[in-house]
């Protein structure tokens, strides 16, 4: 029979598990020291933590380590590459290198110098929208909450507003015509219950099913506000009625300003208003003359049968 665990031993085991979870937990990208906010001491502009100011190229008075996040090295005896026994160091006396990926200072601790370059979270931090890296803009880096892609500070809201849009025009599975119950927010595709699972692959019950294409965790489609991509072909009228109601002039000028900025109500207007009025007056005069000619012709046609009847009566 195994011995019963005492209360003190149970507490120690729980504390071990808790510390293990804390060490292995995933820290959000916005809370990492290499992506911390920084305000320049000289130009007072807010930006991402970096070795030199993005705007004025000045050095910070108190640089922050990109790995451990400390400002002051308080280790009297430790793994410091530059030994300083009995003395606390700050500023440039604490730093040891500049990271090529996040452009931030790394302290002179041996552990930070060896580990940060291999585990820097901003190694491939290129914005999905503008395709700029850390060195091309001064803002911080964020991740999309849907597709988990890198975004700069300027495009993060615009991208996340349009991220839940499928590449297809319906919610059907890409391999069959069944309704896609699972959606991959990175590939922007839907999968049914049969095609989301790969053959010969074991899945955990309590974990989301990975995408068969990119291995990113899929989400249930009904839990998301997914929308489909719509394609509009042909000439689309801008805020007016259909072409059948107004003819072919509806797209160019009907209902206010048309495609070319004209204010006509049914077509083009090449000349000025005065020219149009004069041309209208000339057209009215010509139409009156035509009406008089028509009346004279009608009178002559009516008088001819009367003359024939008079001739017959005299005979």
From Swiss-Prot:
Motif (Nuclear localization signal): 3-11
Biased composition regions of type Acidic residues, renumbered to the chain: 272-303
Zinc finger (C4-type): 40-56, 65-102, 127-147, 173-187
GO MF annotations, alphabetized: zinc ion binding
GO cellular component: chromosome, centromeric region; midbody; nucleolus; nucleus
Residues covered by region (Disordered): 228-248, 263-315
Localization, UniProt: Nucleus; Nucleus, Nucleolus
Record flagged with keyword DNA-binding: no
Keyword Zinc-finger among UniProt keywords: yes
Compositionally biased spans, kind Basic and acidic residues: 304-315
Superkingdom of this protein's organism: Eukaryota
GO biological process: larval lymph gland hemopoiesis
Protein keywords: Metal-binding, Nucleus, Repeat, Zinc, Zinc-finger
Disulfide bonds listed in the record: none
One Pfam family matching this protein: NOA36
PANTHER family according to UniProt: ZINC FINGER PROTEIN 330
Record-stated family: Belongs to the NOA36 family.
Protein name, entry field: Zinc finger protein 330 homolog
Species the sequence originates in: Drosophila melanogaster (Fruit fly)
Gene name for this UniProt entry: Noa36
């Amino acid at each position: 029979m195994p011995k019963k665990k005492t209360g003190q031993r149970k507490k120690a085991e729980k504390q071990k598990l808790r510390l293990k979870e804390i060490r292995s937990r995933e820290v959000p990208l916005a809370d990492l020291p290499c992506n911390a906010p920084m305000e320049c001491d000289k130009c007072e502009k807010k930006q991402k933590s970096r070795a030199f100011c993005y705007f004025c190229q000045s050095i910070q008075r108190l640089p922050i380590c990109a790995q451990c996040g400390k400002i002051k090295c308080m280790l009297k005896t430790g793994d410091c590459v530059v030994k300083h026994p009995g003395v606390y160091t700050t500023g440039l006396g604490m730093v040891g290198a500049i990271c090529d990926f996040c452009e931030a200072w790394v302290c002179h601790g041996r552990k930070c110098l060896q580990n940060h370059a291999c585990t820097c979270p901003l190694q491939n931090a290129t914005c999905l929208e503008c395709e700029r890296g850390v060195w091309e803009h001064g803002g911080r880096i964020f991740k999309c909450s849907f597709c988990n892609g890198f975004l700069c500070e300027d495009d993060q809201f615009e991208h996340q507003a349009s991220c839940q849009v499928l590449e297809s025009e319906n919610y059907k599975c890409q391999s069959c015509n069944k309704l896609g119950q699972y959606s991959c927010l990175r590939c922007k595709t839907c999968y049914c219950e049969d095609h989301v699972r790969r053959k010969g692959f074991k899945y955990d019950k309590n974990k989301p099913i990975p995408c068969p294409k990119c291995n990113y965790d899929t989400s249930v489609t009904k839990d998301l506000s997914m929308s489909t991509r719509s394609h509009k072909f042909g000439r689309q009228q801008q805020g007016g009625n259909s072409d059948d109601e107004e003819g072919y002039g509806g797209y160019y000028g009907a209902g206010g300003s048309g495609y070319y900025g004209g204010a006509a109500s049914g077509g083009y207007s090449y000349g000025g208003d005065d020219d149009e009025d004069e041309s209208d007056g000339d057209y009215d005069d010509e139409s009156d003359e035509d009406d008089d000619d028509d009346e004279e012709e009608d009178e002559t046609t009516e008088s001819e049968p009367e003359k024939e009847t008079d001739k017959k009566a005299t005979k």
